[in-house]
């Protein structure tokens, strides 16, 4: 959740875009409109015109580092914030590579939907890799 103590590059805009009840009466419902809001927000700020997928990748790694730190501290608000930030960055990176994040998610799910395997040391390992 955004607050004055946690001010990262995307947080306030993310909070305002997704938790503004005038625009999103159901803030917990995930749908394509949320990704459209991210893309509109990014376009308005020149991220697509002046940035590129390489800089978005660097931003993604920064956010991954913040997630790692939050996980180590078991800081639930920061974990949520970092995951949200990563979704924003991934949405932008996908768009810059001429993909829609929704299609990327659908493609990934189609690949794993029938995957079999087992848990090994806390990680799911697909059968082909065992």
Predicted regions and their residues:
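Flexible "arm" and connector segments at domain edges
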Residues: 2-83, 87-130
């Amino acid at each position: 959740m955004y607050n004055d103590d946690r001010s990262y590059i995307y947080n306030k805009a993310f909070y305002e875009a997704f938790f503004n009840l005038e625009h999103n009466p159901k803030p917990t419902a995930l749908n394509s409109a949320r990704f459209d809001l991210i893309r509109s927000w990014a376009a308005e700020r020149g991220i697509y015109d002046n940035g590129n997928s390489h800089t978005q990748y660097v931003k993604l790694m920064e956010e991954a580092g913040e997630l790692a730190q939050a996980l180590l501290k078991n800081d639930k608000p920061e974990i949520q914030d970092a995951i949200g930030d990563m979704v924003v960055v991934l949405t932008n990176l996908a768009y810059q590579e001429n993909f829609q994040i929704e299609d990327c998610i659908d493609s990934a799910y189609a690949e794993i939907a029938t995957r079999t395997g087992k848990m090994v040391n806390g990680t799911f390992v697909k059968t082909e890799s065992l």
